[in-house]
């Protein structure tokens, strides 16, 4: 295999796509009445963040032969769903967090009732946005994408992971197998949906979809391992959210099983496996390869 190009600038790539995603998100939900629910929705949706899920969706679509325009509605929908999950995650009945993306959490500003409804609305808006805004993609592929994204939120995805996460809190007998289950579903499912939906929109073949799947599964788990590490070694200012909470609530984490250094090694191994899956695409894979490296080397 010929060597991959080395002049790719990941920071520029991430910045440009983040700007496109945020511009589209800002226009995606126009203000209406009652205004305060829109204020609550937009407070969290415009709070920043890495926008890694939408960027993965755009990158996989382009790698599979599609265009950014084809994938942009789904990319933004994924960010709406991710934002919904953060709003609901932060509620007192869930993780009870008061600080997210460098700001007070949604329910601290708008109350628990509006926070719940804002999350509900974002979930519905996400699927409406895919269905009404996706252009130049066959209808059968749009249906497949909607099914893929929806599945990532069900009890086989994000919800299932959150349920086991909540029920494991404070227990000293949580196994590594259970921890993997939690994060394959709670964190990994939406990252997986981002990669797969982008490829689906471009009409990727089944053998290529399997490569995208294995790439996504590996980076999803690596992402969570590094999140657990950062909760120990980073600062609240860098992360933009509360730190040390896992330790306080006696929640099982990868460092609690392996320690910090071994956790980082395991994440690096997963990223190498992810990259191996898409080297098949040669230079077209460079953005996804660089994003995989970013996931394990990030500091927030």
Curated annotation (Swiss-Prot):
Bound cofactor: record note: Binds 2 Mg(2+) ions per subunit.
Species this chain originates from: Cyanophora paradoxa
Binding sites annotated in the UniProt record for isopentenyl diphosphate: 50, 53, 82, 101
Catalytic activity as recorded in UniProt: isopentenyl diphosphate + (2E,6E)-farnesyl diphosphate = (2E,6E,10E)-geranylgeranyl diphosphate + diphosphate
GO biological process: carotenoid biosynthetic process; chlorophyll biosynthetic process; geranylgeranyl diphosphate biosynthetic process; photosynthesis
Pathway assigned to this chain's UniProt record: Isoprenoid biosynthesis; geranylgeranyl diphosphate biosynthesis; geranylgeranyl diphosphate from farnesyl diphosphate and isopentenyl diphosphate: step 1/1
InterPro entries registered for this protein in UniProt: GGPPSyn_CRT-like, Isoprenoid_synthase_dom_sf, Polyprenyl_synt, Polyprenyl_synt_CS, Prenyl_diphosphate_synthase
Cofactor dependency: Mg(2+)
Location(s), subcellular: Plastid, Cyanelle
Protein name according to UniProt: Geranylgeranyl diphosphate synthase
Function: Catalyzes the condensation of farnesyl diphosphate (FPP) and isopentenyl diphosphate (IPP) to yield geranylgeranyl diphosphate (GGPP) needed for biosynthesis of carotenoids and diterpenes.
UniProt-annotated binding residues for Mg(2+) 1: 89, 95
Entry keyword annotation includes Acetylation: no
Binding positions ((2E,6E)-farnesyl diphosphate): 100, 186-187, 224
Molecular-function GO terms, alphabetical: geranylgeranyl diphosphate synthase activity; metal ion binding
One Pfam entry name: polyprenyl_synt
Listed GO CC annotations: cyanelle
UniProt keyword list: Carotenoid biosynthesis, Chlorophyll biosynthesis, Cyanelle, Isoprene biosynthesis, Magnesium, Metal-binding, Photosynthesis, Plastid, Transferase
Positions contributing to Mg(2+) 2 binding: 89, 95
Family, similarity comment: Belongs to the FPP/GGPP synthase family.
């Amino acid at each position: 295999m010929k060597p991959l190009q080395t002049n790719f600038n990941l920071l520029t790539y991430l910045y440009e796509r983040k700007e496109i995603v945020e511009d589209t998100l800002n226009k995606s939900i126009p203000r209406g009445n009652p205004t305060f629910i829109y204020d609550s929705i937009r407070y969290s949706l415009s709070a920043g963040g890495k926008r890694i899920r939408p960027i993965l969706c755009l990158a996989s679509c382009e790698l599979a032969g599609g265009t950014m325009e084809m994938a942009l509605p789904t990319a933004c929908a994924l960010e709406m769903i991710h934002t919904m999950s953060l709003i609901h995650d932060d509620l007192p009945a869930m993780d009870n967090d008061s600080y997210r993306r460098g700001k007070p959490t949604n329910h601290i500003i708008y109350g628990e009732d509006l926070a719940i409804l804002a999350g509900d609305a974002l979930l519905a808006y996400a699927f409406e946005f895919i269905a009404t805004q996706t252009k130049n993609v066959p209808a059968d592929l749009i249906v497949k994408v909607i099914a893929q994204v929806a599945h990532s939120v069900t009890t086989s995805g994000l919800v299932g992971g959150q349920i086991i996460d909540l029920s494991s809190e404070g227990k000293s007998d949580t196994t590594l197998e259970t921890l993997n289950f939690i994060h394959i579903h709670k964190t990994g499912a939406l990252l997986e949906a981002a990669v797969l939906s982008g490829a689906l929109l471009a009409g990727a073949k089944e053998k290529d979809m399997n490569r995208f799947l294995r790439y996504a599964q590996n980076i999803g788990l690596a992402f969570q391992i590094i999140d657990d590490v950062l909760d120990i070694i980073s600062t609240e200012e860098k992360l933009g959210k509360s730190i040390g909470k896992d330790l306080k609530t006696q929640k099982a984490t990868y460092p609690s099983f392996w320690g910090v250094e071994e956790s980082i090694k395991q994440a690096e191994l997963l990223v190498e496996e992810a990259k191996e899956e898409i080297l098949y695409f040669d230079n077209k894979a460079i953005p996804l390869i660089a994003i995989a490296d970013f996931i394990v080397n990030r500091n927030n």
